[in-house]
UniProtKB/Swiss-Prot annotation:
Species this chain originates from: Arabidopsis thaliana (Mouse-ear cress)
Signal sequence extent: 1-22
Gene Ontology biological process: defense response to fungus; killing of cells of another organism
Subcellular location: Secreted
Protein name: Defensin-like protein 306
Gene Ontology CC entries for this record: extracellular region
Disulfide bonds: C25-C43, C31-C48, C36-C50, C68-C87, C73-C92, C77-C94
Coiled-coil parts of chain: none
Family: Belongs to the DEFL family.
Record bears the keyword Secreted: yes
Predominant cellular place of this UniProt entry's protein: secreted
Keyword terms of this UniProt record: Antimicrobial, Disulfide bond, Fungicide, Plant defense, Secreted, Signal
Length: 99
């Protein structure tokens, strides 16, 4: 009985999360109906994502290069005392290291 209840709860949670994660978008305004704990919602890689500015900061990198330079992103994050979160197109995202 407990096993069945746990499976049911797991399926319920999984189905809710996949609906949120599967929301596609073309620009940031398509993500207005997504509920996030933060106010920053961005459309990246055609998916809506919630960004927490306390942990993630985006910096603009060389705009002539179509891809993010991973090593310069790592160096920048180290210089400000953070770790690399993701390097995507023209932006380097850093976050505070886990405790």
């Amino acid at each position: 009985m407990e096993k069945a209840a746990l499976i049911f709860i797991g399926l319920l949670l999984f189905s809710t999360c996949t609906q949120i994660l599967a929301q596609s978008c073309n620009n940031d305004s398509d993500c207005t109906n997504l509920k996030c704990a933060t106010k920053n919602i961005k459309c990246e890689q055609n998916k809506c994502q919630c960004l927490d500015e306390r942990y993630i900061r985006a910096i603009s990198l060389n705009t002539r290069s179509p891809r993010c330079n991973v090593q310069s992103c790592i160096d920048h994050c180290k210089a400000i005392g953070e770790v690399i979160y993701v390097c995507f197109t023209y932006h380097c995202y850093c976050r505070k290291p886990p405790m």
